[in-house]
Amino acid sequence: MIDISRQLTPSHPNWPGDAPFRVKPGARIAQGDSVNTGELCTSTHTGTHVDAPWHYSETGARLEEVELNRYVGRCRVVTVRAEGGLIPAAALAGLPKRLPPRLLLHTGQPAHWTEFPEDFAALDPALIREAARRGVRLIGTDSPSVDPLTSKTLDAHHACLETDTLILEGLNLAEVPDGEYDLVCLPLPLAEVDGAPARAILLPAGTLPEGEG
């Protein structure tokens, strides 16, 4: 099993302008309480997280309306590199004509962020459309977003909407060899939200029962 989730620490940098990640101490045994507790505050797009379609479309599905099994099943991890800030469709040129339903892109982000990586590699919408033509219905990246930091049109997000492709961002793929795996990605079961942090792991391909697509 390989954990591909980013560890959330007190200094974890969120998207500029988003609510910062923090855990406020609550009860403390050392202060005479019977338990230790904490109050969690964070953006819905902290660390490893999923984007529900409602994040980028007013008529898109909220997280609870997305079938959980779409985040579970066979995937392929591929190392890619950006050209002019975007991962081009040509990055898929050497891959099979038919791909697993889930494609995870290792763009070179480190395992841990000490500051927000503003120059991250985003995805060319043409890559998303080409991946969809090859059977991909979930695209993941180790970058904090599929679109550039300064994008206002969110072309990659809308290419995902157009092709019914789900989005998984902020993965930790630093130590993951390219190849096929079984993905288990479980977003927090939050209602009426545009996304949620998720715990994502990779298992050897074929670990999950047949039928977990």
Curated annotation (Swiss-Prot):
Q: Which UniProt keywords apply?
A: Hydrolase, Metal-binding, Tryptophan catabolism, Zinc
Q: What is the UniProt remark on how the cofactor binds and its stoichiometry? A: Binds 2 zinc ions per subunit.
Q: Which reaction does it catalyse?
A: N-formyl-L-kynurenine + H2O = L-kynurenine + formate + H(+)
- State the pathway, as annotated in the record: Amino-acid degradation; L-tryptophan degradation via kynurenine pathway; L-kynurenine from L-tryptophan: step 2/2
Annotated substrate binding lies at 15
- Keyword Nuclease on this protein? no
* Binding-site residues, Zn(2+) 1: 45, 49, 51, 169
Q: What's one GO MF term for it?
A: arylformamidase activity
SUPFAM superfamilies for this protein: Putative cyclase
The entry's Zn(2+) 2-binding residues are 51, 157, 169
On whether Hydrolase is a keyword of this UniProt record, the answer is yes
Question: Which GO BP terms, alphabetically?
Answer: anthranilate metabolic process; L-tryptophan catabolic process to kynurenine
Q: Where is the active site?
A: 55 (proton donor/acceptor)
Pfam families registered for this protein in UniProt = Cyclase
Q: Which cofactor does it need?
A: Zn(2+)
Identify the InterPro entries for this entry.
KFase/CYL, KFase_sf, Kynurenine_formamidase_bac
Root EC class: hydrolase
Supply the EC number(s).
3.5.1.9
- What is the top-level taxon of the source organism? Bacteria
Q: What does the function comment of this entry state?
A: Catalyzes the hydrolysis of N-formyl-L-kynurenine to L-kynurenine, the second step in the kynurenine pathway of tryptophan degradation.
Q: Which family does it belong to?
A: Belongs to the Cyclase 1 superfamily. KynB family.
How it assembles, according to the record, is:
Homodimer.
List the protein's name.
Answer: Kynurenine formamidase
Say which species the protein is native to.
Answer: Deinococcus geothermalis (strain DSM 11300 / CIP 105573 / AG-3a)
